[in-house]
Amino acid sequence: MAWARDEGGAAVLEILVQPRASRTRAVGEHDGRLKIQLAAPPVDGAANAALVEFLAAALGVRRADVELLRGETGRRKTVRVAGITAAAAVAALAS
């Protein structure tokens, strides 16, 4: 998938976030990125925290293993997930 790659022993994910959705879930690929709908609003970092929590739970890693590299204030985000490969991330999130 174009939205996931291996880099330095971790998976790097390109994500498009839609805050204030009815529920938190991954909805598929959009514009070369994984689109994730978040129930949290984009206020005071709530959406970023919800994204980290969702990814950690979906990928079976600790929240500390999920690091936001780019996009702290935007909808387009780049996230590094330690302890998992890009192929494993795609399998977990695309299902």
From Swiss-Prot:
Query: Which terms in the GO cellular component ontology are assigned?
Result: cytoplasm
- A matching Pfam family: DUF167
State which residue ranges cross the membrane: none
UniProt cross-references to Gene3D superfamilies, sorted A to Z: YggU-like
Q: Which family does it belong to?
A: Belongs to the UPF0235 family.
Q: What is this protein called?
A: UPF0235 protein A2cp1_1215
